[in-house]
Regions:
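Long, contiguous binding/interaction regions
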Residues: 1-86
Length: 86
């Protein structure tokens, strides 16, 4: 059910040296702030960052958010994992 409330995480890996990527990610996250519970940023290599974004909301909304984030130019890998909380 697309309107079911779920929780999960969006995990992305990206090169933090990519021009304008951090700014673009920040704008998307601010646009969807009501769905984002927290963000963890880890430097996993000299050029690579891993970001875990904890999310909660309607399944369809989380899929839309994940699609925008993972589709941002410069994202190397990304995945949305959700679980039922009802």
């Amino acid at each position: 059910d697309k309107n079911k409330i779920v929780a999960g995480a969006i995990v992305i890996v990206y090169d933090h040296h990519k021009r304008e990527l951090n700014s673009n990610l920040m704008h998307v996250q601010h646009d969807y702030h009501e769905l984002i519970l927290s963000t963890q940023h880890v430097h996993v290599a000299h050029d690579l960052c891993l970001e875990t974004i904890a999310v909660k909301g309607k399944a369809q909304s989380l899929q839309s958010l994940a699609h925008k984030i993972i589709g941002t130019k410069g994202i190397k890998h990304g995945k949305l994992v959700i679980t039922d909380i009802e």
